[in-house]
Regions:
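Extracellular parallel beta-helix/beta-solenoid repeat domains
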Residues: 1-227
Length: 227
């Protein structure tokens, strides 16, 4: 394997370039203590296996981190941000990923999406943003535990979605949400916005939730399709 440690990566003016781009099965790469400045994409991983990212600062980026089709990767103790319509974390098709002890902040649009993932452990993270399109997850056998989700007031808080879309929007099977905390402060004029929407799938479990949802009488929504 290869270890990369202690770098500051600076993009061109007005957020251009990618800080770290790894593609294909580059086994056992380790990235530690790396800071991104003025980047369009902080980190992009395509089809990678057993990569470790720790103590990464990709807050000064349009898109913080993007991962696709990897196996047994780890992202921990890192900072990711987004701006200008980007996404702090866009994760798709990952399996056996550990995503823990990270802080993600989205200025607008989505904070994090985990699409088509399996056996992913998302634990002890802090997610902060200001839009309804906040946290999406689909797939199966994922664990989402001990996270703090905070949605602050903003203009255009629904971001093109209906009020029942849900801050946490879940599709899939056998996903387990436990011991999470959600703070949702809704802007005036939004009628009964939903905090958690179990939109599709079966055998998803929600336990030991703390939900602080101001200005809404509709907190947890289960559509007709889940079983």
């Amino acid at each position: 394997g290869v270890e990369v440690n202690g770098l500051t990566l600076v993009g061109k003016a007005d957020h251009q370039g990618t800080g770290i781009f790894v593609e294909h099965d580059n086994d056992r790469l380790h990235f530690f203590n790396i800071r991104m400045e003025n980047m369009y994409q902080g980190i992009k991983l395509q089809g990678c296996d057993a990569i470790t990212l720790a103590r990464i600062d990709a807050t000064d980026a349009v898109n913080g981190i993007e991962m696709n089709g990897g196996i047994q990767n780890m992202v921990t103790n890192s900072l990711f941000g987004s701006a200008q319509g980007g996404v702090a974390a866009r994760i798709s098709g990952e399996s056996n990923l550990i995503f823990s002890h990270n802080k993600l902040t989205a200025e607008d649009d989505r904070c994090a999406s985990f699409t088509g993932c399996s056996r992913v452990n998302i634990s002890d993270n802090e997610f902060t943003g200001n839009k309804m399109t906040f946290f999406d997850i689909s797939g199966q056998n994922n664990l989402i535990s001990d996270n703090v989700f905070t949605v602050n007031r903003s203009d255009n808080q629904l971001n093109g979605k209906e009020a029942d879309y849900g801050v946490i929007h879940v599709k899939g099977e056998y996903n387990h949400f436990t011991s999470n905390t959600i703070h949702a402060d809704w802007s005036d004029g939004i009628e009964n916005p939903v905090t958690v929407n179990a939109a599709e799938g079966e055998n998803n479990r929600f336990a030991s939730f703390t939900i602080e949802n101001t200005n809404s009488n509709q907190v947890f929504y289960v559509s007709e399709s889940p079983e």
